[in-house]
């Protein structure tokens, strides 16, 4: 052992002991003393939220501190053995990083080879079409959930935005991206929707990758075009929520999973862990696609369906275990601010994730499946639905003939989802399953291309027919885009109400509304820089009240006022309300206080 190595070892142990002493200095004294000490370690002398953190972590810090102190002390006492162990471990880590670097180069080269000039241009063209459709429609009026995401989370300082989980509406990684995009580009709807839009557009080349890896390039092209123009995928891409991110991470992890069964590449395994953590940090429902992936990997392990470049089944299992562990550790670290601020109950015990009773679960599932079907097939003609269903069925029936995999992902999906859903008994909202739609479209594309192949058509004929199908899909997608663009070209109802009120408001006015109008109204109020106090119905000095009544939710003037805590003692009061404007879906009334 060189002097430099010995000095490094002693230095690291000294740092451990110093860190331990700081922990113990905060944890062991009484609260007031601990708070004063903690303030010494902050730049401004004020440790925010120290009371909450101290109460939750004190005994854990004491335990961790004592264990580290014991470890560091023993390492210094038995320095020869511990130094030898340290150097051996350091050498292993260095070797692992060298191999990781080499594997990264191999992986990137393999990724580059997925796109020759011709296929690269094809995928780029389809991707640009998909992005174009999404950008054209990005002016859609802001919806309740995305307005709530921005106002309640993304517009706040990051330390608040990424620790507040009072509703699972906070898709944390998406919130982080929206926070950054709105800081850079302003608070317009396009800036708010940019992360979802980018993820939705990147689904297109990701679908090509999965289709080409599972089947062939023709399947990849058709998959990409289906993802580019499918209405519900376009709609989620212009909805500032985290679901397109989850879908993107799903496709990426599945592509990586296929790759690692064919190549013993440590870098790809690490990417599975990193991308997996990103998926969980976006929305915890990423458990479903990620669980299916690891079920499929486990099946490949059991039936030895992996590359001979792995030295053994144990070698494959250890890499799989490391990737899974990396995902768990990174996810736990990412959610630590939430746990410290809101506790684990906000993640696992909120009303939206609690298990249903068996009777409620059995009654709910058929309705949710119908909701999912209606959402996925809305604005889609039967002319397209039937071929997709036929293609999906063929991909399952002809799996062994058309797929490059011996173990189908469909089997892993059944083996994982059925027991998990029966144990968990969730309320399976349609949006939970969006990540699977691009995969289903890949399977459908594979079935259609596989059918052409089974008909013994030439490669040129398959190419022409596939191109023809893509052209038909493109025309249908563009027609649908033109129709929607005409609707979105004008301000939506809520935005128009705000614009109309902006020139009418005066001192003593108040604007009253309720769900689902109130949150979008607050957003447009904010971007138009109007006085937020006017939206406060608790204001005692009210001269005039504007009331928004949303007809699709069967709201009434009296119902809106009552919901906002305004008692109606005199029926004559409602009769004196004057209808200012009929917006079709909403009515705007004005009531004078006198």
Where are these regions (language model features)?
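N-terminal hydrophobic targeting signals that begin at the initiator methionine
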Residues: 1-2
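Membrane-proximal helix-loop-helix interfaces that form the catalytic/acceptor-binding platform
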Residues: 6-111, 119-456, 461-591
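An acidic-aromatic substrate-binding cleft motif
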Residues: 116
């Amino acid at each position: 052992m060189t002097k430099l190595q010995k000095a490094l070892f002693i230095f690291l142990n000294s740092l451990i002991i110093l860190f331990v002493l700081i922990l113990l200095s905060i944890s062991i004294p009484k609260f007031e003393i601990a708070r004063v000490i903690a303030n010494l370690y902050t730049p401004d002398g004020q440790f925010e939220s120290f009371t909450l953190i101290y109460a939750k972590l004190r005994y854990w810090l004491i335990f961790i501190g004592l264990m580290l102190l014991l470890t560091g002390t023993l390492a210094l006492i038995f320095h020869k053995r511990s130094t030898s162990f340290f150097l051996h471990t350091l050498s292993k880590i260095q070797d692992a990083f060298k191999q990781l670097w080499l594997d990264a180069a191999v992986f990137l080269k393999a990724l580059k080879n997925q796109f020759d000039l011709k296929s690269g241009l094809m995928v780029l063209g389809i991707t640009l079409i998909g992005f174009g459709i999404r950008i054209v429609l990005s002016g859609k009026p802001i919806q309740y959930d995305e307005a709530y995401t921005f106002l309640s989370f993304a517009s706040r300082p990051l330390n608040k935005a990424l620790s507040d989980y009072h509703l699972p509406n906070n898709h944390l990684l998406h919130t982080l991206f929206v926070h950054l995009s709105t800081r850079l580009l302003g608070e317009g709807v396009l800036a708010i929707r940019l992360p979802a839009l980018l993820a939705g557009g990147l689904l297109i080349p990701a679908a090509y990758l999965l289709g080409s890896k599972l089947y062939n390039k023709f399947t990849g092209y058709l998959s990409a075009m289906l993802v580019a123009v499918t209405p519900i995928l376009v709609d989620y891409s212009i909805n500032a929520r985290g679901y397109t991110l989850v879908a993107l991470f799903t496709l990426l992890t599945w592509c990586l999973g296929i790759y690692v069964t064919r190549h013993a590449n440590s870098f790809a395994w690490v990417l599975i862990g990193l991308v997996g953590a990103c998926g969980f940090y976006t929305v915890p429902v990423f458990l479903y696609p990620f669980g299916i992936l690891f079920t499929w990997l486990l099946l490949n392990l059991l039936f030895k369906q992996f590359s001979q470049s792995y030295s053994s089944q144990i070698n494959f299992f250890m890499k799989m275990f490391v990737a899974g562990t990396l995902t768990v550790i990174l996810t736990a670290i990412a959610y630590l601010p939430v746990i410290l601020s809101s506790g684990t109950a906000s993640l696992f015990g909120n009303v939206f994730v609690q298990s249903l009773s068996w009777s409620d679960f059995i009654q709910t599932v058929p309705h949710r499946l119908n909701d999912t079907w209606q959402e996925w097939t809305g604005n889609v003609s039967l002319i397209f639905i039937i071929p997709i269903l036929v293609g999906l069925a063929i991909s399952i029936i002809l799996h062994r003939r058309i797929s490059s995999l011996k173990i189908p992902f469909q089997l892993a999906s059944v083996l994982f989802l059925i027991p998990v859903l029966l144990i968990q008994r969730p309320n399976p909202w349609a949006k939970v399953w969006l990540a699977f739609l691009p995969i289903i479209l890949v399977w459908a594309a594979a079935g259609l291309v596989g059918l052409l192949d089974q008909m013994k058509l030439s490669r040129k004929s398959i190419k022409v027919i596939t191109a023809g199908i893509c052209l038909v899909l493109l025309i249908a997608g563009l027609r649908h885009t033109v129709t929607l663009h005409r609707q979105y070209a004008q301000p939506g109802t809520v935005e128009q109400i705000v614009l109309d009120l902006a020139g009418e408001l005066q001192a003593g006015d108040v604007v009253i509304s309720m769900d689902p109008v109130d949150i979008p109204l607050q957003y447009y109020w904010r971007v138009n820089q109007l006085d937020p106090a006017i939206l406060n119905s608790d204001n005692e000095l009210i001269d005039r009240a504007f009331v928004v009544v949303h007809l699709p939710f069967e709201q009434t003037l009296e119902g809106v006022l009552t919901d906002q805590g305004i008692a109606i003692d005199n029926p004559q009061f409602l009769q004196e309300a004057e209808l200012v404007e009929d917006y079709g879906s909403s009515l705007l009334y004005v009531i004078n206080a006198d």
